[in-house]
Regions:
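Nucleotide-sugar donor-binding/catalytic module of glycosyltransferases
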Residues: 1-213, 253
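Catalytic core of nucleotide-sugar-dependent glycosyltransferases
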Residues: 210-235
């Protein structure tokens, strides 16, 4: 099973090296790594080129202007030749060197279309400090209707499923992942598996955790849930927020 991992990047010189190194360090042998940079104006491109030196046989790298993260990810998906698509955002890094190996083992055992797992949010400056602990839990379709979704960077999805069910809607600036996940998990009736292991470390302060973006996220989430006919739509959004509360409590005991 070939896995294509996509990293989108724009002006992330402080964090991109860690993200790239964490993917290149994976012990799973059949990984295609795709890095899509949006013509960064800082030193991101130089750092990427330096980090991937010697790994050109497994890395595809492009740098060109785009209209945001979701366009970049869609470019990467269209470039991908793997059986499975996964993401490692430029602010994040893989949890361990054997993460992909564990994911593939579970996907092969379950013959699933869509796998999700657990993840942790860490302090932006001190990545050893855990801020939130995201435990995905067992999948149930009704939970999606009640605002639950898996943590986006923990998702590993069959590429043929993505091409059939649709890629990221680029009209969204923040909630295209919410839209895609609701579509896949509520509408597409996929075979879903849950891996009860941490697979990613995410820095707080990313696009979906930045307080300055929360109003826009609220509006975009309402648009998503309205589009799928979830009523009352505001209650669904509030329940989505409520699912996050236990994560902060669990983090205190890590």
């Amino acid at each position: 099973m070939k896995v294509s991992i996509i990293t989108s990047c724009y002006n992330r010189e402080k964090t991109i090296r860690g993200a790239v190194e964490s993917v290149l360090a994976q012990d799973y042998p059949d990984i295609e790594y795709i890095i899509v940079d949006g013509a960064s104006k800082d030193h991101s491109v130089e750092i990427i080129k330096d980090t991937i030196a010697g790994h050109e046989d497994k890395v595809k790298f492009i740098s060109e202007p785009d209209h945001g993260m979701y366009e970049a990810i869609n470019k990467g998906i269209r470039m991908a030749t793997g059986d499975v698509i996964a993401l490692c955002h430029s602010d994040d890094f893989m949890y361990a060197k054997d993460t992909v190996s564990h994911v593939v083992k579970k996907m092969e055992e379950t013959d699933c279309d869509f796998l999700y797992a657990d993840g942790i949010f860490v302090n932006e400056q001190n990545t050893s400090k855990v801020v939130r602990k995201w435990i995905g839990g067992k999948f149930a379709r009704w939970k999606v209707r009640c605002g639950w979704l898996p943590l986006h960077p923990t998702c590993y999805i069959k590429r043929d499923v993505m091409m059939k069910c649709g890629l990221y809607d680029e009209s969204y600036k923040i909630a295209a992942d919410t839209n895609l996940l609701v579509n896949y998990l509520y509408n597409c009736h996929l075979k879903v598996a849950y891996l009860p292991e941490f697979v990613t470390r995410m820095r707080m302060g990313g696009m979906s955790t930045d307080a300055s973006k929360r109003k826009k996220m609220w509006n975009e989430d309402i648009r998503v849930y309205t589009g799928y006919g979830f009523k009352p739509v505001t209650l669904t959004k509030l329940m989505k927020m409520a699912w996050k509360v236990p994560q902060f409590i669990k983090a205190k005991f890590m």
